[in-house]
Curated annotation (Swiss-Prot):
InterPro entries: Ribosomal_bL32, Ribosomal_bL32_bact, Ribosomal_zn-bd. This is Large ribosomal subunit protein bL32. Belongs to the bacterial ribosomal protein bL32 family. The keyword Ribosomal protein applies. Keywords: Ribonucleoprotein, Ribosomal protein. GO terms for biological process: translation. GO terms for molecular function: structural constituent of ribosome. HAMAP family: Ribosomal_bL32. Pfam families: Ribosomal_L32p. It comes from Clostridium novyi (strain NT). GO terms for cellular component: large ribosomal subunit.
Length: 60
């Protein structure tokens, strides 16, 4: 079986591992109706529109 020739430092080991555990950012886009930031492919929490149609009626 293969054995490491040199001891790997903790910082070298951890920096290599950090690449696999990266978190991806959620897709945040601007709402075309009210221009607020919202999650992509979801109803806007401010105006209630999705794909140009009013899904949730927002009453003031």
């Amino acid at each position: 079986m293969a054995h490491p020739k040199r001891k790997m430092s903790k910082s070298k080991r951890d920096s290599r591992r950090a690449q696999t555990f990266k978190l991806s950012l959620p897709g945040i886009v601007e709402c075309p109706q009210c221009h607020e930031m919202k999650l992509a492919h979801r109803v806007c929490k401010d105006c209630g529109y999705y794909d140009g149609k009013e899904i949730v009626s927002k009453e003031n």
